[in-house]
């Protein structure tokens, strides 16, 4: 957006809700998610495991990654196919979560080795790419160029 002084700026819309009992399906939460078109789901489980930020990577999403103009911008700014890489990474994490649940139910020997591979691959993505130390000078924020190198 163009500011009155001639500089460019942006507007960020943030909608927050804290539903009683954590019910994310109640009407106010659903309306807020629909208006914001993105969702950061905080996870008590991740916080308990000291995995910060405690944003659940499976439940969280951004509908903006579906907009052609955003895809085009990211293709130009980072690299062609960036949204596909992000989608693939989220898929790895989702499959790892599913595999972890099966391993917990059936035990280590009750699942094929591929489940363990999926789980440990998702753990690697979680530890290396998703988790951050906000107090660390380097790890406090991740520039796009570093994100690109990490996903390559």
Predicted regions and their residues:
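P-loop NTPase catalytic core
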Residues: 1-152
């Amino acid at each position: 957006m163009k500011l009155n002084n001639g500089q460019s700026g942006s507007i960020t819309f943030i909608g927050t809700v804290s539903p009683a009992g954590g019910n994310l399906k109640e009407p106010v939460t659903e309306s807020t998610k629909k208006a914001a078109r993105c969702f950061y789901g905080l996870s008590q489980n991740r916080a308990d495991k000291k995995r910060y930020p405690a944003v659940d990577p499976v439940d969280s999403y951004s509908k903006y990654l579906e907009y052609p103009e955003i895809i085009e911008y990211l293709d130009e700014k980072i690299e062609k196919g960036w949204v596909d890489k992000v989608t693939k990474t989220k898929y790895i994490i989702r499959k790892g979560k599913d595999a972890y649940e099966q391993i917990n139910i059936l035990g280590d020997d009750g699942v094929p080795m591929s489940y363990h591979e999926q789980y440990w691959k998702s753990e690697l993505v979680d530890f290396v790419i998703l988790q951050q130390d906000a107090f660390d000078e380097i790890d406090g924020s991740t520039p796009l160029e570093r994100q690109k190198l990490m996903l390559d």
